[in-house]
């Protein structure tokens, strides 16, 4: 009898765990979609203010329902497939881009809970999948994103779309090298590939290590502009040259999926910047009353500040030429990133500040032992 009882309890446990996981996934997806909608609203409002305009102000109070009106407009538009295009690839491309933009959020920790285990405080991040190779997972997902763009440009049977796709692929591949090396400097200082552990380690570090990694934060931020095809590096979508780039032939929901994927990636890469360089869910200053505010609020506020910088740059800085973009990535950021990897390694070794033995941090994986 006990055998069947154990099978039943295991089955109920699996069902409950699956239900909790499904709820987490749906909560993250809905949050990202709503964030994308109001990021577009924020972008239009900020650019309007910089250009001395009002921005959206008709649909709903203060124009707050404008994103939903835009969504309805895209849904009811006619879906047109270009003549002589590869229809299957043409339809799959936006699905790939949108899906990969959401998959990256699986390892992003939004906050953390603190529990006591054998007299030690252990921090458990609030994340869908707390995997040991979270950083590698993020890099792999971001690298795969270029396939959706390449497929879209090739399958559209349009020279404008194909040139935009080639530009986007070369641009993303070029700046992923710099982004990867900047992340390596953080890994050298923290000693973990788990994003939650990186946040905890950065919080417990001395301030001089934060100053040492500050130039890499600048390189990461500028490279993220190029990685997400944002101004002033939006060469794949140069309206004056390529009309709209790789998505020029798309309309209705396929276009909306590209649009959602682009802005979801924009939020994701700023979430990565907050985790690697700006303290994650911890307050910006180590003051006791600031810890009353939940960590997820600090996490979101930091992302909003970086997104505002993205929008500000779009409204004020002119577009780079393509040769300037490539030169910046390969002749400036790549040498600086390589130099900083060596410099950080040497400084950590010389000052005996290598991770684990330097900070004495109780990490999440201790619960697994």
Swiss-Prot record:
GO terms for cellular component: plasma membrane. It comes from the Bacteria. It holds the Pfam family NADHdh. Disulfide bonds: none annotated. The chain crosses the membrane at residues 20-40, 88-108, 133-153, 179-199, 205-225, 267-287, 293-313, 328-348. Keywords: Cell inner membrane, Cell membrane, Membrane, NAD, Quinone, Translocase, Transmembrane, Transmembrane helix, Ubiquinone. Its main location: membrane. It is a multi-pass membrane protein. Its EC number is 7.1.1.-. The keyword Cell membrane applies. It catalyses: a quinone + NADH + 5 H(+)(in) = a quinol + NAD(+) + 4 H(+)(out). It is found in: Cell inner membrane. GO terms for biological process: aerobic respiration. Belongs to the complex I subunit 1 family. NDH-1 shuttles electrons from NADH, via FMN and iron-sulfur (Fe-S) centers, to quinones in the respiratory chain. The immediate electron acceptor for the enzyme in this species is believed to be ubiquinone. Couples the redox reaction to proton translocation (for every two electrons transferred, four hydrogen ions are translocated across the cytoplasmic membrane), and thus conserves the redox energy in a proton gradient. This subunit may bind ubiquinone. NDH-1 is composed of 14 different subunits. Subunits NuoA, H, J, K, L, M, N constitute the membrane sector of the complex. This is NADH-quinone oxidoreductase subunit H. It comes from Ehrlichia canis (strain Jake).
